[in-house]
């Protein structure tokens, strides 16, 4: 058997990993500005944590979860999304306690797992950035969280981003709409895809979310959920729209958007961008005011979003955005002869401990090959260290671009490399 990575997974090599680290760093910095703290939850959860919260009839649970029984006969699943594990942790760790400052603002970055057909920007192991805010029913929370995602996209330079907005209302208004949708779709049941015929019985709102051509045709003239909002739901949605306008965040109303998870109420949203003529969802989320109670905690409002890192990086690449990744090395040591081996290690370590990036040759290559490595690493400074330099206790350091040189003692290198660097690079 040829040993290779499983289907739908990837190896992220150093050149690409630098881009991942940059995007993750910008996300962390942005979320910190909004007073969010990082949470890390297990990669696997008890099956019920996901099935009961995400919804037994969703595609995630019925088709896409990686689940198994462990050696203790416990039903376990690899997490397919981030919200349910964070809510479970919020309840289990009693973050609802009065002494904990509200709202509780959390973000996470990590792997998720879904068994689905691998395609561009969508893998079986994928990486998600997500945020969850607990304890505030204020529509300003909805808008602040949406604005935070918008702020992140601005920082990354992503263009042509459109906010799509809808409201699912309260449980009561959603139930009234559910019945209206059943009444509308039942006469055309035979025209729906097989999946949507099942959804009509189990979760009719999901028919609106279908990507199948026949389903899209069927729901074109479906009733709008906004016509079924009760007074409280309408007021919440109007406040969200007003505050988005106050922040100059443009939006479009999309009444067919329902989101693929069962726990949402009131505001739901997606950010969509255009890549090579196709619309791609870059980020999605919404409000979920009953989920904490569902996990055995006190009734607690919640709002959050998730975005896929693979898709985000694909969009960055397709839009021709150059990420400002530091690729230059401060100094490269070319090493000649066994007599210089130990001193080279000593010097390169001392330079690194002063905060500089440094590399040396370990392979005993010819000097030309070592200088080529220095160029490949984009080294600003190059030093050649042979047995004669070791005997003298000093060596020449050269600016790799201007060719300016400076003879420096080992003692100065090991204690004051910053001054040497400034002299050669200024």
From Swiss-Prot:
One of its GO terms (cellular component) is cytoplasm. It is found in: Cytoplasm. It comes from the Bacteria. It catalyses: tRNA(His) + L-histidine + ATP = L-histidyl-tRNA(His) + AMP + diphosphate + H(+). Pfam families: HGTP_anticodon, tRNA-synt_His. Coiled coil: none annotated. Its EC number is 6.1.1.21. One of its GO terms (molecular function) is ATP binding. One of its GO terms (biological process) is histidyl-tRNA aminoacylation. Homodimer. NCBIfam families: hisS. This is Histidine--tRNA ligase.
